[in-house]
């Protein structure tokens, strides 16, 4: 919404020293988004005067028609002599009043005017068009021709209001009242604490039986319709300069007097209007829904096929306008140009000022891709009480400017409606803002926006008709807070109650993320949506529980209509994208929720919004949610350690995936078991099953290892890609939430290395478990540091596993014999359990 400061001053007595920037700051403080302040005529300098064309000499011999004119500018040139000017325009004649810029002046854009020789003549100035003066398009595309009564020599800068400031306001969807000068003036008056001269306060005659007949068939779509008639409009009447300039400043193009007046009143009061040529309207004006197959040619010359939900204005022939959007060409106003071309100029008009349903107008405008100034206002909300005043204002201007006669008949049809009232505690704004405003301030601010307020501790507030956005107590609180100034709200740090903070689940989530990042993994956050074809790509069995998914009612993509049951699809897709873009050495991780439908999945009930949900309501909502455990997963490909002068490096392998699971388990302070496994996407010979022990029973919580070559090929992944996925919530349940500080012994450690030869199919985890149990309580740690599988030295189907054993006693220094005895016991049990023998 463009708001000229000069127009704003008509309704608010702003201090003379206030600039557009000052008003901008005030309105921004009050909550309006004033984006820019345009300075019209900022670099314009006179003399710029009204002149009268005395003579015109046609110059010949040039590529385009050129005229040499003498123009009377009065005493503006200091001599009183006619001014000689060369001009190429053709839309003026001898006797016309024009705008003349004299030597020494500067036009917008820094264009300086001086006497210069051109086309064999000396031109002492220039006859101006609207574009050259920065006025925009006036529809003539030529020289400005002023009304005959304009005084010669008058200052054209003042006459044409060329110097002004225009505020450009981005009006939000809830503030339709600010799509008018009246609405912005009201906000300005409040911001400055000044009275408002409301242009809608007019003496409006009441409805009677003599008005133009109107019938409303759809009172839901149109709850108010005012019709007024003006006859005897002069065919020669044109929009005065001040009206044209105001329309240009707000961004509209002058068209004809009747149309310009309706546009002017719309910009002034915010009420869209439409003028029909009375001679072209046949019978009763009606408001109804369109019928299938009906068509209308709108004012832009486009034939439109109507939809059954379109609200239309009709006469006895059919549609004559798209209600609230655009009028029809079959009742269009004909101006003086039509009369000059042999047609009949409109002399009698019917003025429509109506109130239409917001949703209906918005849908019609979008359906026909036809956004207009009228539809923009109806979509955001128009004051239904302004229709009669807007119609009266239009009638008054047409009578004043076009010499018309206002007929006595007044048609006004309105559906009964009660004003909207809200009961609000007087201290509610205080509670919302955390500031003690007091009852007097709350009442004063609400009255300033137009509310009627009664009551003491409990206020009964009647909302003004122009503010349909004020719907509940929080809207009223917002009005008080914004008018008191958002910048005056104190900045205070939140003070949570003692004992609050992150939950144990949140702390574990963060610890795991930090640990994996420290181990060289990069976090990747993926969408939680999957397509069911991904389970086939991962090689899951037909009866695998992971195939049971929660489907979305309105998915973002038809290809991914379900919520994930595993983190791997998203992580593997991220790895594939990165690998395809040249990043081949990858280690990614993600912690996030997966979703499993419950056995008895319920549908969440629609809760009312006028009260806080009860505990039962919240419990019912929780029961309708799917199970959402938190998982952690990693994927690896390429080099795990880079090659360089320090060594050969090494590729990522299944052991890295298993180690990432152990890293997660350490952060959860849980005992994680590892054994040979086989599941879905993993290579059957290189898959580890991860488990925890709960009440003496082992429970599988994840898998780790190298992915199956078939899965890699199907998904387009690099060779030897490895992955791990764990149920993090399951680890949390068996873990110790209280961190245990490790005991620090003052006694030295005794290290013993053993290399055991076992069958190739024996998992290292089983060997390690036997060594731990056999070594007893003196064993502090065990680490596998070498795997060797030379058939010539070890025999066919055999491998060597080398472990570093660390022994330490809490109360003494171990002797060599004690450490050796513990080692021998460990080796003996490993031999008994898995057939391990010491490598010689």
From Swiss-Prot:
tRNA-binding domain mapped to chain residues: 42-157
Tagged with keyword NAD: no
Cellular location(s): Cytoplasm
Cofactor remark: Binds 2 magnesium ions per tetramer.
Listed GO biological process terms: phenylalanyl-tRNA aminoacylation
PROSITE patterns listed in its UniProt record: B5, FDX_ACB, TRBD
Primary location group: cytoplasm
Classification via InterPro entries: aa-tRNA-synth_II/BPL/LPL, B3/B4_tRNA-bd, DNA-bd_dom_put_sf, Fdx_antiC-bd, Fdx_antiC-bd_sf, NA-bd_OB-fold, Phe-tRNA-ligase_IIc_bsu, Phe-tRNA-ligase_IIc_bsu_bact
Residues holding Mg(2+): 469, 475, 478-479
Keyword terms, alphabetized: Aminoacyl-tRNA synthetase, ATP-binding, Cytoplasm, Ligase, Magnesium, Metal-binding, Nucleotide-binding, Protein biosynthesis, RNA-binding, tRNA-binding
Broad EC category: ligase
Domain spans labelled B5: 417-491
Alphabetized GO MF terms: ATP binding; magnesium ion binding; phenylalanine-tRNA ligase activity; tRNA binding
EC number: 6.1.1.20
Family note: Belongs to the phenylalanyl-tRNA synthetase beta subunit family. Type 1 subfamily.
NCBIfam families reported in the protein's UniProt record: pheT_bact
Quaternary assembly: Tetramer of two alpha and two beta subunits.
HAMAP family assigned: Phe_tRNA_synth_beta1
Protein name: Phenylalanine--tRNA ligase beta subunit
Organism listed in the record: Streptomyces coelicolor (strain ATCC BAA-471 / A3(2) / M145)
């Amino acid at each position: 919404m463009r708001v000229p400061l000069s127009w704003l001053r008509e309704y608010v007595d702003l201090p003379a020293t206030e600039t557009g920037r000052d008003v901008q700051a005030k309105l921004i403080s009050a909550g309006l988004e004033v984006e820019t302040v345009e300075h019209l005529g900022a670099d314009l300098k006179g003399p710029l005067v009204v002149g009268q064309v005395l003579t015109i000499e046609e110059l010949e011999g040039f590529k385009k028609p050129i005229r040499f004119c003498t123009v009377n500018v009065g005493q503006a040139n200091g001599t009183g002599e006619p001014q000689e000017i060369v001009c190429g325009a053709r839309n003026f004649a001898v006797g016309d009043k024009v705008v003349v810029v004299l030597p020494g002046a500067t036009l917008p854009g820094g264009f300086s005017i001086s006497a210069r020789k051109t086309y064999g003549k000396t031109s002492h100035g220039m006859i101006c068009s609207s574009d050259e003066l920065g006025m925009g398009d006036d529809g003539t595309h030529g020289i400005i021709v002023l009304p005959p009564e304009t005084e010669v020599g008058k200052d054209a800068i003042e006459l044409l209001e060329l110097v002004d400031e225009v505020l450009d306001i981005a009006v939000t969807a809830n503030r339709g009242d600010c799509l008018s000068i009246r609405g912005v003036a009201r906000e300005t008056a409040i911001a400055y604490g000044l009275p408002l001269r409301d242009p809608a306060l007019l003496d409006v005659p009441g409805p009677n039986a003599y008005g133009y007949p109107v019938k409303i068939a759809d009172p839901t779509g149109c709850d108010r319709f005012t019709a007024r008639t003006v006859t005897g409009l002069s065919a020669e009447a044109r929009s005065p300069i001040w009206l044209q300039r105001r329309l240009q400043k707000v961004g509209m193009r002058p068209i004809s007097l009747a149309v310009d007046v309706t546009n002017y009143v719309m910009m002034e009061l915010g009420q869209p209007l439409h003028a029909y040529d009375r001679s072209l309207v046949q019978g009763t004006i009606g408001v109804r829904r369109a019928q299938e197959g009906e068509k209308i040619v709108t004012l832009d010359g486009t034939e439109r096929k109507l939809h059954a939900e379109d609200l239309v204005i009709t006469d006895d022939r059919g549609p004559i306008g798209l209600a609230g959007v655009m009028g029809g060409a079959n009742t269009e106003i004909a101006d003086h140009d039509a009369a000059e071309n042999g047609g009949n100029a409109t002399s009698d008009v019917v003025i429509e000022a109506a109130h239409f349903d917001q949703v209906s107008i918005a849908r019609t405008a979008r359906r026909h891709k036809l956004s207009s100034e009228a539809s923009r206002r109806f979509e955001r909300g128009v004051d239904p009480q302004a229709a009669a005043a807007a119609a009266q204002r239009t009638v008054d201007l047409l009578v004043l400017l076009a010499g018309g006669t206002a007929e006595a008949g007044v048609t006004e049809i309105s559906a009964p409606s009660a004003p909207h009232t809200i009961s609000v505690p007087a201290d509610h704004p205080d509670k919302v803002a955390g500031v003690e405003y007091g009852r007097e301030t709350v009442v004063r601010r609400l009255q300033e926006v137009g509310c009627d307020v009664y009551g003491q501790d409990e206020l009964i507030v009647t909302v003004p008709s122009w503010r349909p956005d004020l719907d509940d107590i929080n809207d009223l609180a917002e009005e008080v807070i914004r008018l008191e100034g958002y910048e005056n709200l104190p900045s205070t740090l939140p003070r949570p109650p003692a004992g609050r903070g992150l939950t144990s689940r949140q702390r574990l989530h963060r610890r795991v993320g930090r640990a994996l990042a420290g181990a060289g993994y990069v976090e990747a956050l993926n969408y939680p949506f999957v397509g069911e074809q991904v389970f086939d790509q991962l090689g899951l069995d037909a009866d695998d529980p992971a195939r049971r998914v929660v489907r979305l009612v309105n998915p973002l993509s038809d290809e991914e209509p379900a919520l994930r049951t595993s983190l791997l699809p998203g992580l593997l897709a991220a790895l594939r994208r990165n690998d395809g873009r040249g990043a081949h050495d990858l280690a990614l991780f993600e912690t996030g929720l997966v979703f499993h439908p419950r056995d008895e999945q319920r549908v969440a009930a629609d809760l009312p919004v006028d009260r806080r949900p009860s505990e039962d309501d919240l419990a019912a909502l929780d029961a309708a949610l799917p199970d959402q455990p938190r998982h952690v997963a990693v994927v690896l490909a390429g080099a795990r350690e880079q090659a360089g002068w320090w060594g050969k490096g090494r590729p990522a392998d299944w052991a890295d995936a298993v180690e990432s699971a152990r890293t997660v388990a350490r952060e959860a302070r849980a005992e994680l078991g590892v054994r040979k496994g086989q599941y879905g996407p993993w290579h059957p010979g290189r898959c580890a099953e991860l488990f925890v022990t709960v009440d003496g029973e082992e429970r599988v919580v994840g898998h780790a290892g190298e992915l199956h070559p078939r899965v890699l090929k199907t998904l387009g992944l690099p060779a030897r890609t490895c992955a791990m996925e764990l149920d993090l919530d399951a680890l949390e349940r068996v873990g110790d939430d209280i961190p245990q500080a490790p005991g620090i012994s003052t006694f030295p450690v005794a290290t013993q290395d053993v290399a055991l030869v076992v069958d190739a199919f024996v998992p290292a985890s089983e060997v390690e478990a036997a060594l731990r149990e056999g070594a007893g309580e003196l064993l502090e740690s065990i680490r596998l540091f070498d795997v060797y599988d030379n058939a010539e030295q070890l025999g066919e189907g055999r491998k060597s596993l080398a472990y570093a054993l660390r022994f330490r006693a809490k109360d003494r220094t171990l002797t060599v014999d004690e450490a050796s005895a513990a080692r021998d016991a460990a080796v003996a049990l490993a031999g008994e359990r898995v057939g391990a023998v010491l490598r010689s």
